[in-house]
């Protein structure tokens, strides 16, 4: 099925690309999420008329994401207190929700879906580097300092 992409889609293309995808992927994911429209003659003409507007909208979203990433990077370190044993092992773990709540409390709104933990949840005290994917192209880094209560 031919579709016109209205947004950047990973491993598929960017705004304005006409790509061939499986019908189920287009019907169940791309079209309902507003990431693509079927490539009919009417939609192609409509898209070409609105292309500049859509590109400007995408640029605004990217600029807003860059601004949020700068705010997150400006935090540098965030401290989270948790119960821990003698050797520095935590009772339980610190996951994406705990990190998102701590960063939000520090003054920058972050959703738990934006937190990236490449090594899994945090299970020890000390400093851990955590990445945030604010946008498909924009990343930020914060050092999380886990201390024992």
UniProtKB/Swiss-Prot annotation:
<dbReference type="GO" id="GO:0006412">
    <property type="term" value="P:translation"/>
</dbReference>
<dbReference type="InterPro" id="IPR009027">
    <property type="entry name" value="Ribosomal_bL9/RNase_H1_N"/>
</dbReference>
<dbReference type="GO" id="GO:0005840">
    <property type="term" value="C:ribosome"/>
</dbReference>
<dbReference type="InterPro" id="IPR000244">
    <property type="entry name" value="Ribosomal_bL9"/>
</dbReference>
<dbReference type="InterPro" id="IPR020069">
    <property type="entry name" value="Ribosomal_bL9_C"/>
</dbReference>
<dbReference type="InterPro" id="IPR036935">
    <property type="entry name" value="Ribosomal_bL9_N_sf"/>
</dbReference>
<dbReference type="GO" id="GO:0019843">
    <property type="term" value="F:rRNA binding"/>
</dbReference>
<keyword id="KW-0689">Ribosomal protein</keyword>
<keyword id="KW-0699">rRNA-binding</keyword>
<comment type="function">
    <text>Binds to the 23S rRNA.</text>
</comment>
<dbReference type="GO" id="GO:0003735">
    <property type="term" value="F:structural constituent of ribosome"/>
</dbReference>
<protein>
    <recommendedName>
        <fullName>Large ribosomal subunit protein bL9</fullName>
    </recommendedName>
</protein>
<comment type="similarity">
    <text>Belongs to the bacterial ribosomal protein bL9 family.</text>
</comment>
<dbReference type="InterPro" id="IPR020070">
    <property type="entry name" value="Ribosomal_bL9_N"/>
</dbReference>
<dbReference type="InterPro" id="IPR020594">
    <property type="entry name" value="Ribosomal_bL9_bac/chp"/>
</dbReference>
<dbReference type="Pfam" id="PF03948">
    <property type="entry name" value="Ribosomal_L9_C"/>
</dbReference>
<dbReference type="Pfam" id="PF01281">
    <property type="entry name" value="Ribosomal_L9_N"/>
</dbReference>
<keyword id="KW-0687">Ribonucleoprotein</keyword>
<dbReference type="GO" id="GO:1990904">
    <property type="term" value="C:ribonucleoprotein complex"/>
</dbReference>
<dbReference type="InterPro" id="IPR036791">
    <property type="entry name" value="Ribosomal_bL9_C_sf"/>
</dbReference>
<keyword id="KW-0694">RNA-binding</keyword>
């Amino acid at each position: 099925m031919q579709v016109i992409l209205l947004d950047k889609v990973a491993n598929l293309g960017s705004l304005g690309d006409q790509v061939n995808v499986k019908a189920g992927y287009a019907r169940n994911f791309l079209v309902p999420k507003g990431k693509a429209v079927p490539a009919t003659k009417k939609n192609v003409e409509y898209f070409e008329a609105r292309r500049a507007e859509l590109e400007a909208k995408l640029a605004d979203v990217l600029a807003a994401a860059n601004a949020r990433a700068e705010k997150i990077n400006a935090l540098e370190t965030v401290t989270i207190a948790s119960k821990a044993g003698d050797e520095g092992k935590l009772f339980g773990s610190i996951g994406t929700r705990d990190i998102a709540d701590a960063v939000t409390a520090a003054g920058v709104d972050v959703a738990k879906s934006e937190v990236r933990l490449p090594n899994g949840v945090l299970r020890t005290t000390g400093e851990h580097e955590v990445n945030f994917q604010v946008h498909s192209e924009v990343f930020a880094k914060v050092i999380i300092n886990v201390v024992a209560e």
